[in-house]
């Protein structure tokens, strides 16, 4: 999902290995964890949740979004679980946000992301 001047969302791959791993893990949702006080500033990586039939805002463990909006997206605070931050190459996130999308906010062309997790 690509929403210019707001977020990019990914993680839900249609690759066969991803489908296999999801079957092994099973279907489950995670409760929001908003007590840490992390704000949805530009570059924050957070967990999305559906607003449809989801009053407790449970999140998919298989997806994530990155705040691209300059100035942050603080209206998301308290509703979604931030768990990381882009520390290099925000220009890549900006370039993804510049891609053409269809009416469902899906990129016209496949965008593959390689993500490296750095622990403190």
Where are these regions (language model features)?
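Cyclophilin-like peptidyl-prolyl cis-trans isomerases
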Residues: 1-120
């Amino acid at each position: 999902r690509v929403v210019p001047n707001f977020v990019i969302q990914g993680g839900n791959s249609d690759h066969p290995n991803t489908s296999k791993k999801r079957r092994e893990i099973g279907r489950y949702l995670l409760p929001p964890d908003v007590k840490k006080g992390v704000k949805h500033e530009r570059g924050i990586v957070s967990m999305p949740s559906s607003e449809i039939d989801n009053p407790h805002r449970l999140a998919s463990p298989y997806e994530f979004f990155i705040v691209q909006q300059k100035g942050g997206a603080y209206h998301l605070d308290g509703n979604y679980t931030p768990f990381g931050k882009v520390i290099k190459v925000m220009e890549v996130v900006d370039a993804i946000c510049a891609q053409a999308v269809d009416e469902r906010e899906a990129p016209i062309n496949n965008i593959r992301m390689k993500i490296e997790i750095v622990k403190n």
